[in-house]
A protein has these predicted regions:
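Intrinsically disordered, low-complexity protein-interaction/activation regions
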Residues: 4-155
Length: 155
């Protein structure tokens, strides 16, 4: 058996620290306005609807949803399923590209036929509140999205 050097131990510690830092790829703020940060910088979404799709999936707390379910909730007044499905595919592709640009491509999961957010890879005030009950919620939740009012009322 080889003796272990201090350098070997430090290398292993750095590897473990690196893994821990990589565990949470994004910081997501749901209380107040919905915002997403990567490495302390605000993530820029090309389309507001892409950001809203991500917010919607966060609101679902990692639950898998089919494209049809997402369209039914996100486009309730539009009955053109083909058009809605095509638009959703564009939004999903845009979301994938946005997340990839900040090194967080694994956050969005596509498990045919469903989409979901891998909540283990994000730090989120809403999810932390649900898990711990710490009093972080001050009455405002994803204020820019009217569909989030139901969740806000439940909190």
């Amino acid at each position: 058996m080889k003796p272990i050097s201090a350098e070997d131990v430090q290398t292993e510690i750095n590897n473990i620290k690196g893994l821990r830092q990589k565990e949470k790829l994004l910081t997501v703020n749901c209380f107040g306005n919905f915002e997403v940060y990567a490495n302390g910088e605000k993530v820029t979404f090309k389309r507001m609807k892409t950001k809203e799709l991500f917010a919607f999936l966060i609101d679902r707390r990692g639950a898998a949803m089919t494209a049809k379910q997402i369209c039914a909730v996100r486009f309730p007044d539009d009955e053109d399923d083909v058009k809605n499905a095509a638009y959703l595919r564009q939004l999903v592709m845009d979301l994938k590209n946005t997340l990839k640009s900040v090194g967080a491509e694994n956050v969005l999961r596509h498990e045919t036929p469903c989409y979901r957010v891998d909540t283990s890879l994000i730090r989120c005030d809403y999810l932390t509140y649900l898990e711990t009950g710490k009093p972080e919620f001050l009455g405002e939740y994803m204020m820019q999205y009217s569909w989030a009012e139901d969740t806000c009322a439940a909190l």
